[in-house]
Design a protein with these regions (language model features):
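Non-catalytic accessory regions of SAM-dependent methyltransferases
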Residues: 1-46
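Solvent-exposed alpha-helices and their adjacent loops that cap or buttress functional pockets
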Residues: 21, 97, 136-138
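Non-catalytic substrate-recognition/targeting regions of SAM-dependent transferases
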Residues: 30-36, 41-43, 59-125, 133
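Conserved alpha-helix/loop element of class I SAM-dependent methyltransferases that forms part
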Residues: 126-142
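Conserved SAM/SAH cofactor-binding pocket of Class I
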Residues: 137-161
Length: 161
């Protein structure tokens, strides 16, 4: 088993028990240093995977990571974004059909439109899923001003609280 396949498989075994597939089809699979892949995140959007690199990686390393994902999950699509400081974001379709510009995902039974093509990420920060759920609980009967929003996901959760 390749080292990247081992890392991704370990990350998956740690997280799969926390995903409620009847209510959620998006989650962070690999979270950078915490999963022994420095400056790399891998997010799952239904059957589509987004790999984001925040430091330079050699192409052969990127290929090995994509191959490991494909061997473990057989995704419909793998998209890669390279987000280096001071440079434009580079988005590349690694394989599969291009994802439609307005792609709908579900998190905690709430639907969101995301885009793999716009901006640095998709606008839905998957590492904030639990915080959004907490806002939903804490905001019940209160008013909330969300001054720093991209997809307004925190506001949507607050409105449903």
């Amino acid at each position: 088993m390749s080292p990247y396949k081992r890392i991704i498989d370990k990350a998956w075994s740690l997280r799969k028990k926390y995903i409620n597939y009847t209510a959620t089809n998006v989650f962070r699979l690999v979270n950078s240093y915490g999963d022994a892949l420095p400056e790399v995140t891998i997010d799952v959007y239904d059957k589509n995977f987004l790999i984001q690199y925040f430091k330079p990686y050699e192409e052969h390393t990127k290929n090995k990571i994509s191959i490991a994902l494909n061997e473990i999950f057989k995704p419909e699509n793998i998209t890669q974004k390279t987000r280096l400081k001071g440079e434009d974001v580079e988005t590349r379709l690694i394989f599969g059909p291009e994802i439609p510009k307005d792609f709908v995902v579900v998190e905690n039974s709430i639907k969101f439109n995301i885009s793999f093509q716009d901006g640095g990420g998709t606008g839905l920060f998957l590492d904030q899923r639990d915080n959004r759920k907490k806002i939903q609980t804490l905001s019940k009967g209160k008013e909330l001003l969300n001054c720093f929003c991209y997809t307004s996901s925190f506001s949507v959760y607050a409105g449903l609280g």
